[in-house]
Amino acid sequence: MEQRISIERMEQAVNLFGSFDENVRLIESEFKVTISNREGELRVNGEVEDTMLAVKALNALLTISNRGEPITEQNVRYVISLVRAGQEDRISELTQDVICISSKGRPIKPKTIGQKKYIESVLKNTITIGVGPAGTGKTYLAVAAAVAAFRERKVNRIILTRPAVEAGERLGFLPGDLQSKVDPYLRPLYDALFDMLGAETYQKYLERGNIEVAPLAYMRGRTLDDSFIILAVEQNTSCEQMKMCLTRLGFNSKMVITGDVTQIDLPADKMSGLKQAVRVLKDVEGIGICELTDQDVVRHVMVQRIIKAYADYEAARNEKRKK
């Protein structure tokens, strides 16, 4: 069977095919078809079902190209997963969702349907708990939402914090050199802020007190009004720490809690506060629980494969335990 797709501009074809035709080769390999570009048309040949799936994938990628975005391998693999699930039409939902503009003028957008739902939860709810594997953009998108709220004067401060169990953090115990110890653990937050604001603007807001980046234990005893609070990597908080963090919320504030329950560094006899919070707060009004999956990973494709392999391994182990 042969299907044809019209290409209006040469730039579309260049973007769609990718460097050394790698994007099209990936679709050919996935759906067992051949794709050629002749006289302003894409010609797709293969078995009927395979050809129809490949055409759906190509049309979805053209939707991405038409909105002026470069087509990457990650785009192609994500579109393929949507086509396999019969959800390729949902790619158009991502076209208008600009969260904020980076310091270099780049629009920050959700790249997957899961990320879109996550951002919608952040905007709708007072507290959002985002749970998912590494590389799903949990913290980065939360920082983007915080910067957008700050620029629109919806909040006066952005507060970012994360635990540092490896640095010896305990409630009520703050070693004098804790800040220097936890700086490496706060680096992902710094990087996201630098990308959104630029180093100079970040430093200016930091000096004014509009931005605060601090270890988790510094939050104790405070009430945080008019703030956008991000608690990152919260799988490493104890249940007591999590409750302490949640009760810091003040008036006109919003809180986002992110974590990956597969990367817990707490002692074996301690329950993760994040796990408990998801169970306890799932039905509380004003709190959104958003679960991202390996399909939402926007890092190197190998990261997605590794996450899936570990998930399959854990699922197999749990199945054996049940037996």
Annotated model-derived regions:
Residues 16, 23, 54-57, 242-245:
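Hydrophobic side chains in well-ordered alpha-helices
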Residues 1-15:
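Short glycine-/aliphatic-rich beta-strand segments at the starts of folded cytosolic domains
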Residues 85-106, 110-113:
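Conserved loop-to-helix interface motifs that mediate assembly, gating, or partner/ligand docking
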Residues 25, 31-34, 38-40:
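Compact, well-ordered interaction domains used in eukaryotic information-processing assemblies
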Residues 36-95:
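Interdomain "pre-motor" coupling segment immediately N-terminal to P-loop NTPase/helicase cores
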Residues 41, 103-231, 235-323:
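Conserved helicase motor core of SF1/SF2 NTP-dependent helicases
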Residues 12-29:
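Short amphipathic alpha-helix segments
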